[in-house]
Structure formats: structure tokens, C-alpha cells
Amino acid sequence: MIRFEIHGDNLTITDAIRNYIEEKVGKLERYFNNVPNAVAHVRVKTYSNSTTKIEVTIPLKDVTLRAEERHDDLYAGIDLITNKLERQVRKYKTRVNRKHRDRGDQDIFVAEVQESTTNNHADDIESENDIEIIRSKQFSLKPMDSEEAVLQMNLLGHDFFIFTDRETDGTSIVYRRKDGKYGLIETTE
């Protein structure tokens, strides 16, 4: 069963909002033969321009489902989040079930979800089955700090850059966020 931890930033989470989130995101349970014991972390944030940002993260045993959406209408944003999460589950379900079938194991996910859902998303599933790596690249990581890595990323015109952090000697990644700012991912051992 999926439990919910719902937090609001600049917004009070009313029973109506809580119920709507639990009802919509809770529908993901239908994709599992054995519903995992999971916690859905939901953060709802409102901004001064009345835009709402909804983030949902559901860590499972082998995968973390995560979706984020900004919308003027909170409820429409929740619907869009649910659609994104369903696409992620279907994509993952297809891969996992294929792998387990090849090994002769029982499917982890429900083989068929309502026929209407399957028909509506047949194109999505077909394109998700064909993962094709079209280019492979090898390079050595240079030691630098995160500011230097951002400069290198911008010089190359990329959206991310992998480097060896000079201070920690670990592999790190800087990336450009949707809001134009930068993020840093640091690896741990």
C-alpha cells in the first residue's frame, strides 16, 4: 500500500487537496501484482504569481518514480503528475516483465491493466521498448571545482558536464536546470 507524506510550502494542505492527491496517485497501485510498501513524498509549493509546483517522489525497491509539474491550476497539475508517473510505471513494467519472462519468473507487475488504458498508450509502450544507444563516448575526467565545470559546460554548449571534484576526488556532475540555474550531483562510495 502506498502511504502519503504531503507537505505544502506557502499553502495549507486541505483535506480536499490531500484526498485528491491520494486518489489520483493511489491509482498507481493497480499496476502492481503485490502492492509495494512505499511512501509517496509529495511537495506542493505556490508562488506569488499563483503558479503551483507539485513534486512527487516514490522510492521503490529497484526504481524511484519521480515527477514534477508547474501549473496555474493545482488540480490540473496533479492530473499531469499522475500521467507522468503512470508513463514511468508502464515503461519500467515493460522492461521488468520482459526480463523476468526471459528468466521464467513470474511477472512483478500486473500483465494487463484495463484495456482502454492499454489501447490509449500502445504507441508509448512501443517506443519505450526500443532503447537504442546511438553514440558511445569515452573521455578522461579532469580534476576541477564545480564553478570551473559550469564554465566548461557553458563553453561546450552542453546541459551537463561530468568531472572529478578536486576537493573530494569523487566523480561529480553539474547540470543546467529548467529554471536556468545550475545543479550539482556528487557521488558517494
From Swiss-Prot:
Keyword Cytoplasm: yes
GO cellular component, one term: cytosolic small ribosomal subunit
Molecular functions per Gene Ontology: ribosomal small subunit binding
InterPro entries named in the record: HPF/YfiA_ribosome-assoc, HPF_long/plastid, RHF-like, RHF/RaiA, Ribosom_S30AE_C, Ribosom_S30AE_C_sf
S-S bridge residues: none
Major site of localization recorded for this protein: cytoplasm
Coiled coil: none
Cell compartments where the protein resides: Cytoplasm
Keyword hit for RNA-binding: no
UniProt keyword annotations, A-Z: Cytoplasm, Translation regulation
GO biological process per UniProt: negative regulation of translational elongation
NCBIfam families given in the database record: yfiA
Family that this chain belongs to: Belongs to the HPF/YfiA ribosome-associated protein family. Long HPF subfamily.
Summary of subunit composition and partner proteins: Interacts with 100S ribosomes.
Function: Required for dimerization of active 70S ribosomes into 100S ribosomes in stationary phase; 100S ribosomes are translationally inactive and sometimes present during exponential growth.
Entry protein name: Ribosome hibernation promotion factor
Annotated organism of origin: Staphylococcus epidermidis (strain ATCC 35984 / DSM 28319 / BCRC 17069 / CCUG 31568 / BM 3577 / RP62A)
Record gene name: hpf
